[in-house]
Amino acid sequence: MQDPASHSDSLVGRVEVKETTCYMCACRCGIRVHLRDGEVRYIDGNPNHPLNKGVICAKGSSGIMKQYSPGRLTQPLRRKAGAERGESAFEVISWDEAFAMLEERLAKLRAEDPKKFALFTGRDQMQALTGLFAKQYGTPNYAAHGGFCSVNMAAGLIYTIGGSFWEFGGPDLERAKLFVMIGTAEDHHSNPLKMAISEFKRRGGRFISVNPVRTGYSAVADEWVPIKPGTDGALLLAITREILDKGLFDRDFLVRYTNAAELVIDDPSRDDHGLFYRAEMHVEPDCFDPQNKLWWDRDIDGPISTHTPGADPRLMGRYVLPDGTPVKPSFQLLKERLEQYTPEWAAPITGIPADTIRRLAHEMGVMARDQKIELPIKWTDCWDDEHESVTGNPVAFHAMRGLAAHSNGFQTIRALGVLMTVLGTIDRPGGFRHKAPYPRPIPPCPKPPHGPEAVQPNTPLDGMPLGWPSKPEDLFVDAEGEAVRLDKAFSWEYPLSVHGLMHNVITNAWRGDPYPIDTLFLFMANMAWNSTMNTVEVRKMLVDKHPNGDYKIPFLVVCDTFASETVAFADLVLPDTSYLERHDVLSMLDRPISEFDGPVDSVRIPVLPPKGECKPFQEVLVELGSRLKLPAFTNADGSRKYRNYPDFIVNYETSPGSGIGFLAGWRGKGGDQFLKGEPNPHQWEMYAQNNCVYHHELPRSYQYMRNWNKGYLHWARAHGMIRYAEPITLHLYSEVLQRFRLAAQGKRPGRQPPERLRQRVETYFDPLPFYYEPLESRFTDTQRYPLNALTQRPMAMYHSWDSQNAWLRQIHSHNYLFLSPKVGLAQGFADGDWVWVESPHGKVRCMCRFSEAVEPGTVWTWNAIGKGAGAWGLAPNADEARKGFLLNHVIAEELPAHEAGEHLSNSDPVTGQAAWFDVRVRVYKAEAGEPEVTSPQFKPMPRLPGQEKKRGKWQAYVAGIFGKQAS
């Protein structure tokens, strides 16, 4: 091998280092891309980036192989005339032809019935733009992948504490002493969390992981607590009961910062039963909780306005107000609810011994009580009380999809929020800390459209396609209480479906329920494979026809970077760029990368020109918005407003003159303003000069207690993050849920649920968290199907993005079913055998591996490693297709017909969260002589026009050999 130092610059070639933001997962680390003669040769972490500080993972460094993947789409494609959908029979067309097709079709739909156009996207990180496009077009049928991912986590915590894990908050491991992680796979939060856990353990912190599987983060935990899937709520409620019984809750925190002491009307005969008693009745603003409630003061032994100086409210007891109204503090109601949830009750449900549950509760409670943190930071609360320091209780939690992806996930996550609250850990040192733009009011201000009248020809929606209902009047239903959206979000079936129900879109569109559509536009959403449930049947729906020969879903547009399984079914294919070829924003209007100490947003700036005819999806939307003359994309005379996407990002404002746009940094003509300021024509250049990231560090006095921090709330209002500088009281007791329950009981005027759904709403909209068995288990013979089945993301793969990656395939080219040896022993098969995994909905054949690191009643596998033959540029006989498998084949997207409806989604009844972890299976050995290949198999997908036929010279590159010798 030759020494590169001995070569001249002319032999080495032109070497450049360019900075941008990674997109190999949702972590969005800063990266440096090293190029030689315009080709990517190395990617490393940017040491000057506040998020990852130079650290990079296997995914991030493998972005080279994503860039040069043979799975790349490079030209717009149209299904050939006479060819059947699903056959991948395409012809190349120009972008002018593609835009003309879309403009003609979408303009006609917008002029006649905008809801016949549906736009659904995957993990795209640009929902502020896609949501804006849908609103401006006038279609309610829009959502991203959240309903399929972790909407229960977002909704469950935001409706409880005003913020959530992941982008909007997380564990303060810098100061925590006890860290409890529940239901979190290896991909979530990635580098920053790994770095934080490493430092936490070096400082002697104790790490407990609660998970059915011990992989990834759990493997480095001090204690692994295996739990049966879907029973986390039972554990959390039992722990909370123990903490209350032992008096280990933070009374001062509960009184001052939560609704624990607020008096709730306790008279089931009244129509306002379960609502807070209000000292004055008036029309409430849309999005803050007025401080017009009462406490029961122990000194005067009577009612008093909340936060009266010197008041000492009671948390327990039953009282009668002077007007005869019986009331209880909401904490009393919580305590009564928890009486049934003993450790002995929870033990057989969770598989965790009662003594362990008691020990965990004691450990959390004592740590929070006895190891308090005090920081010398002065701050002033909303009631003008000045504090000399910020205090904290050093117990931190982190949780994700393991809790969320169940039909009981919303109430489970409400239970987690209540536990975190009674321990006094919210936005305090060592506990949970918010990230801008959160905290927000409970619930946040935006609301969905209110009814069918919101959808009008050639008119934007009167609300956002997605929002945060606070009462039945906020639902998006017709006069009969039935859904207006295609996915039935914001209907009485799933009232708080704040992220939509992507997983039911194809089924509903195929059935024409609640109505037929014309055009389904999918971006980066592999909805014919791993981004759906009941995959075999969904693929059939995409090709199903009416008796007259027309497709039941008339027109399908797919925009993607790669030849995914879904591309085969498209009528029109739009080739997206890679993340190294485009401008992109990770915006405060969307899902930013903020830190605990203040807002952070970032950008991607092209380091390479687009491959072939690829065009960024963002450019596609700006172009379509201009052609369709959508108001946000055009001037008053209908002329085009923005040259392109970068111009749109610089000059767009949320309202004329608001000074608030997609990017927070370097605003104002001279780039000297932040968060709010007039457009800066040099904004992109300033981001490029500053590591592609903007980090605004708040004053220390604004960094904690932000729900009630006067300085922070006024700052947040001034910079457009919230509308009102009002305290954001934590909701131990949810009056929002009680309003829906009262409507279901017929005790509330206005919108009422259809009769078939009254019992469903009354049951699941409980204002206090409760545990119930996952819905699918009620319709499944659990004796025949005794095992829970799960998937999780491996550390080296993210969704289905990376199975075409030449480097990462060497780590995961196929997946196994992992299970306890006890299952194999009972069923007569051995480690490595071919087995069948069967549910009531379908079955898959795969190879198994025994593992002691799994709860004995659970089987699991890596998600999205299995691929359809020929997809993603892989050979039809690739391991991903022959040995890899997809568990989605055995998961139903709908529940069996029952009293609440014939076609209810297999989802959480509150949020519509896909319940893909609820599935029950049995596992048995494949018969001798069966093919040693996974099942089901599908017809191989041929290589598409524009895909590379062979791998380029870049894959033969050897470090240390430069210039022409490497070619």
UniProtKB/Swiss-Prot annotation:
Ranges in a coiled coil: none
Compartments in which it is found: Cell inner membrane
Assigned keywords, A-Z: 4Fe-4S, Cell inner membrane, Cell membrane, Iron, Iron-sulfur, Membrane, Metal-binding, Molybdenum, Oxidoreductase
GO cellular component, one term: plasma membrane
4Fe-4S Mo/W bis-MGD-type domain sequence ranges: 15-71
GO molecular function ontology, one term from the record: metal ion binding
Reactions catalysed according to its record: a quinone + sulfite + H2O = a quinol + sulfate; a menaquinone + sulfite + H2O = a menaquinol + sulfate
Residues holding [4Fe-4S] cluster: C22, C25, C29, C57
Superkingdom field: Bacteria
Enzyme class, UniProt record, top EC level: oxidoreductase
Membrane topology: Peripheral membrane protein
Loss of function: phenotype: Deletion of the gene causes a strong decrease in sulfite oxidation rate.
Required co-factors: [4Fe-4S] cluster; Mo-bis(molybdopterin guanine dinucleotide)
CDD domains from the UniProt entry: MopB_CT_2 (cd02783)
Annotated cofactor note: Binds 1 [4Fe-4S] cluster.
EC number: 1.8.5.6
Oligomer and partners: Forms a heterotrimeric membrane-bound complex composed of a catalytic heterodimer (SoeAB) and a membrane anchor protein (SoeC).
Role: Part of the SoeABC complex that catalyzes the oxidation of sulfite to sulfate.
Family: Belongs to the prokaryotic molybdopterin-containing oxidoreductase family.
Protein name per UniProt: Sulfite dehydrogenase subunit A
